[in-house]
Amino acid sequence: MSIYGENDKQGQYWNEAPGQSWVVNDTAMNERLETILDILFEGLDSNGCNNGLDIGCGAGSTTRHLATIMGNRAKVTGLDISEKLLALARSHPESSGKNFLQADAQSYKFEPEGFELAISRFGVMFFESPFKAFQNIKSAIQKGREMRFVCWAPLLANDFFLSPLNTVVDITGVTFEEPGREPGPLAFSDRTYLSSILKTAGFFSINIDTVETSITTKDSVEKNASLLMEVGMGFRAIKEAAPTDEVLDEIREAFVTDGNKRLQNGLIRYDATIYRVSAMA
């Protein structure tokens, strides 16, 4: 088995150029996802929890937030497949005392029932076998304790993905099909499918709440356009289209124009819809 466990393709992806893009844009993306972070942690009961797990922790902002909520005596582990993102997580001045582990949550041999709480912000949609992954994650959580995560609802309900994607498709003519249930941001956009996976993996008291929210940024329209060239569905379509530099400039300018249309009171805003998922192990 490779160092990426049973998710070799995703391991390579997140440890190469795309992973580096998320390292570079970590601060910018944390700003955009701040409201969603609040939604994830809203009403989370960490009483009596001494060991917490953050699945797909990336550069560690959610891990640090979890540690703050759980208190100084708690032990918090952030797990991710990307060493690039974990290196950034470990370098943060507030990461002292947190454990950051490079591993594949689908196949990693967790200590049985070693955690009393598990959370994730958009970190659980990238498994080759979601059933096996959640079954393995469940084994790491004490019986009767909560797993809480957020994931994306369908593409059409998320402007931050849809708008840049449509722009690239319109300009380049590239064919871009929705990835469906393949590992990726939208893998769990079908809530019935998601619920069935969790039930089959052995979770109970499953609640999937649809939450309408927004992604906002104080960045300039130019800086926002640069980010859209490097992350998200627009970026994926650009990779597929392989446009010339001239066409890339056209795409960037279109992103700037769209940003100006969305700009109000100093904020660029995109409508977003997510699922907030709670399940008991």
Language model features with spans:
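Conserved class I S-adenosyl-L-methionine
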Residues: 1-49, 61-65, 85-88, 92, ...
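C-terminal helical/coil "lid" or tail adjacent to the Rossmann-like core of SAM-dependent
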Residues: 2-28, 207-265
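Class I SAM-dependent methyltransferase SAM/SAH-binding core
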Residues: 51-108, 132
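Short glycine-dipeptide loop
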Residues: 72-73, 141-147
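A short acidic, Gly/Pro-enriched loop at the edge of an enzyme's catalytic core
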Residues: 106-117
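A short SAM/SAH-binding and catalytic strip from SAM-dependent methyltransferases
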Residues: 116-131, 153
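Conserved catalytic/acceptor-binding region of the Class I
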Residues: 131, 146-219
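Core SAM-dependent methyltransferase catalytic element
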Residues: 201-204, 225-226, 273-281
